[in-house]
Amino acid sequence: MKKRIRTIWAGVLCLCPVLALQAGWGDLQEQLRRMVADKKVGIAVIVDGSDTLTVNNDVRYPMMSVFKFHQALAVADVCGQRGVSFDTLVHIRPDDLRPDTYSPLRDKYPEGNLSLSVGELLKYTLHLSDNNACDILFRVFGGPAATDEYLRSMGLRDFAIEATEDDMHRNLADCYRNWTTPLEAVRLLEWLVSGKAAKGAYRDFIEQTMISCQTGRDRLPAPLAGTKAVIGHKTGTGDRNGKG
């Protein structure tokens, strides 16, 4: 029987004032270390684009579907360079809609042979974590290698994106080919907020889609429910075999 493993990242997209830290960075870091002692958890915090704090940042964490956020930024870059909007249509073929994976897109359009906009596909990937929509975007926008190359051109280093959703479904070991450190993941969130990665309407679309994300509401956003914090996040959940 397959077990489930979760890889979770979440960031506060700074649309509300950052709460003043009651303790110094060193004290906060020590508190966080104690909280996650003996657990496979990595933490990274960036405040005002410069002050950083990390815990267990020297591990390559498998991203699972978290890389769909990275993909969205690469898609935005290509659209920006081409001067086209997220309204650009993409034809969806029947063989794009694999039956053996999580895909609300396939459930809604089981026959394929239709066109949806890039923005609609991004809503499926970021909002619902649709695996087929992700691989359709890879087909159109250059595959994992293009996303990896774009992020490296921006200065990201401690990460890799090499596998599609179909690759990971066929071979669980391929899940480890898409990895990141906590700091690089949070740095990418900070770049989105600041406009360094994705600009204008592209940035606004991705940010708002992540804020309205429907997956993982019972995970990291849960403790902040009812507060003034505005949470934008992308979770990832994958399978593991009996050996872990």
Task: List the model feature ranges, each with a label.
Residues 1-27:
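Bacterial Sec-dependent N-terminal signal peptides
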Residues 21-65:
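Beta-lactamase-like hydrolase cores
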Residues 40, 135-194:
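Mid-domain, small-residue-enriched loop/turn segments at the edges of structured enzyme/sensor domains
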Residues 62-90:
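Active-site SXXK
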Residues 69-70, 176-211, 244:
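Active-site-proximal alpha-helical segments within enzyme catalytic domains
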Residues 86-105, 141-142, 209:
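Acidic helix-start/capping segments at beta-turn-to-alpha-helix junctions
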Residues 97-136:
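Conserved catalytic neighborhood of penicillin-recognizing serine enzymes
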Residues 218-244:
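Short, Gly/Ser/Thr-enriched beta-strand-loop segments that form substrate-interacting elements
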